[in-house]
Amino acid sequence: MTLKERFLKYVAINTRSDENSESFPSTAVQWNLLNALVEEMKLLGLEDVTIDKYGYAMGTIPATKGKEGAPVIGFLAHVDTAPDMSGENVRPHIIECYDGKDITLNNALTMRVADFPELSKFVGHTLIHTDGTTLLGADDKAGVAEIMTAAEYLMAHPEIEHGKIRIGFTPDEEIGRGVDFFDVKTFGADFAYTMDGGYEGELEYENFNAASAKIAIQGRNVHPGYAKNKMINAIEVACELNNLIPAVERPQFTEGYEGFYHCVGFNGTVENATISYIIRDHDFEKFEKKKAWMYDTVGMLNNKYGQGVLTLTLKDQYYNMRKMVEPHPQVIDNALAAMREADVEPIVRPIRGGTDGARLSFMGLPCPNIFAGGMNFHGKFEYCSLNSMEKAVKVIINIAKKWAE
């Protein structure tokens, strides 16, 4: 099976995760792809192929003769797609030798170069895009397809020397639960890489420190005709809180290493309201200050409206993996060298998000993130470059070789 065939097969399987579910995986449909990957690994001849009760699918490419003592390297990707948009009945469209012009997704929707100027970098590439009614699922089925294609190649070419390689596929990454039950010891890798990045050349070993904040507001509903000095409108209190957030510290005004507060949900009546945020910053000190600001602001509003009107629940989600990866420079050096040997110019920059690898790094498995070739994740404008995906396969193979040198 070719890389392209694999990818098209995988995106046809709905694997949308659900943040409101309490099961794990959060949706039963994820098992369809996970079980298919287990069978495919077995057909390719991988050893120690397993899937546990949580849906973690793993397999081993055994070390070539004489390289059994090399570090064990892992490659990981997640099978779920974001709950932001439907991943069911995905109908990919393929453009051979993209000409750099606007792309018609359907009769009512066009992906314009003016809106997505990075399209101009893909002239001459084979692009795979949506029909405008679903997301594509390149995040992260591009990574899944690349790992499986590299595994097939290495199994078929024993002359390529490498140590033991472990590959793994996880559910529920998109809702932040991807490695909640992942057994690092069972996986058995010394170092690993997630194939979950975007643009060709991306190598990321810095990510946000992340927290979630949920504020419940207890209002006081009184007939509006007689509400003076009595009513507390929970909706207006929520709006007041939101308006206190510095405008420049919102996602649409930040880039690079700049953190933010992002309102991700609101539900309310005069009597009750809830407003939810995610808090992000690469710098831990700034991250802590952002959390402290939220506590202080809620306290200030409680002083204004009455103690107990606002109740804040704030939880840390994950941390910047940099401090866990930097003590192992070979992890980055080998990835950089592998990219250059694949004729890929490395782009080292911080992830403005998080990956399974961020949490795994704090669980004892240093795990930076490598490009998978997709763009515009989580929505109807998602697309990927088959050329970049092919480069990612070469990078995986080259990394395997590098660790055995």
Predicted segments, located by residue:
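N-terminal capping segment at the start of a domain
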Residues: 2-28, 128-129, 221, 318, ...
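Active-site-adjacent substrate-binding region
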Residues: 236-253, 260-262, 309, 319-368
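Midchain, well-structured core segments that form catalytic/ion-binding scaffolds
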Residues: 103, 119, 125-138, 172-302, ...
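Short, conserved micro-motifs enriched in small and acidic residues
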Residues: 28, 134-145, 228-236, 383-390
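A non-catalytic alpha/beta surface segment that caps or lines the substrate-entry region
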Residues: 22-70, 74-76, 80, 90
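His/Asp/Glu-rich mid-to-C-terminal helical/loop segments that flank catalytic regions of hydrolases
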Residues: 32, 232-251, 285-300, 333, ...
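Active-site metal-coordination/substrate-binding segment of hydrolases
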Residues: 67-164, 169, 189
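Short beta-strand
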Residues: 48-53, 265-267, 349-350
